[in-house]
Amino acid sequence: MPQKVRIALDAMGGDVGASVVIPGAAISLNRHPDTEFLLYGNGALIEAQLAAHPAMKAVSRVIHTDVAVGMDDKPSQALRRGRKTSSMWLAIDAVKKGEADVAVSAGNTGALMAMARFNLRTLPGIDRPAIAAVWPTLRGDSVVLDLGATIGGDAHHLAALAIMGSAMARVLFDLERPTVGLLNIGVEEVKGGEEIREAAELLRSLNLPQLDFIGFVEGDGIGRGAADVIVTEGFSGNIALKAAEGTARQIAEYLRSAMSRTLLSRIGYLFARGAFNALRGKMDPRKSNGGVFLGLNGIVVKSHGGTDAEGFAYAVDVGYDMVRYDLLTKINQTLNRHGHTLAPASAVQEALS
């Protein structure tokens, strides 16, 4: 395990770029002083931000490039124009070369996935990477995947997601045998499509010591924390993620409107301010920022493109944790034992936009 965690940052990624990336990384550095940074992007813009963060500057190396992947670029365009020259590619390439332990970017999701997969390649037994993230629930946190890396997938693909997600849960939640559920339209064994029923049978037959497969979980089970790990293919996973984010914003707006409607409600808010602040903190999407690309020969973390510095700091924190607690080793240990059962999926369409 490295004495220092070396993090490569795509300083040009996201809606704003360096003015969020550098302050965000500085916040994370305060929490994890055993961190060093490689900063890829426009050197002048990066140095201007570093001037306000001397502690960050002291542990950073700036690698200049004028090429940045646009948020609207198609993955094929990003690969064609930005391969080997863009800030996004160079950050990923630093992981491949062993110069960094993890790459973090707030850039274009499709381009980041395409570049990461093209450069790092997938692990043995893994046909498609997945995006996994921590999801706040009523009983704590869960790992949910896939949140949009691929569309569709057969039973072997879903079983591979379960293995990788359980490894992430063991790392983050310090669990010996995380519970794993497959997202479905019902909990009965006869519910759902053929692929998900076959995945359930495969996971039961494997009886892996690293995870406790509990069967199917319905949509409301995500928020209830019905399992430590909830597995689905990327189409439904991304819909679930966006629906949850929208619901959180809707509830926050309802509360804000209700608490400011009358003088009496404003007075009531003053008495309940502590409870409302706790609720706001629990629902803050910034604290769940940072989707991990699982299934690659290296660790890549995707931040929301429109986040602020505090939100980006949480994405950097996720990358730090994945390295410090040796996520790749834990995934590989399981795949080495059971990878022969996870033959590549035959019909999985990659989501590149």
From Swiss-Prot:
It catalyses: a fatty acyl-[ACP] + phosphate = an acyl phosphate + holo-[ACP]. GO terms for molecular function: phosphate:acyl-[acyl carrier protein] acyltransferase activity. The keyword DNA damage does not apply. One of its GO terms (biological process) is fatty acid biosynthetic process. Signal peptide: none annotated. Keywords: Cytoplasm, Lipid biosynthesis, Lipid metabolism, Phospholipid biosynthesis, Phospholipid metabolism, Transferase. Pathway: Lipid metabolism; phospholipid metabolism. Its main location: cytoplasm. Its EC number is 2.3.1.274. InterPro entries: FA_synthesis, Phospholipid_synth_PlsX-like. It is found in: Cytoplasm. It comes from the Bacteria. GO terms for cellular component: cytoplasm. Disulfide bonds: none annotated. Homodimer. Probably interacts with PlsY. Belongs to the PlsX family. This is Phosphate acyltransferase. It comes from Nitrobacter winogradskyi (strain ATCC 25391 / DSM 10237 / CIP 104748 / NCIMB 11846 / Nb-255). The gene is plsX.
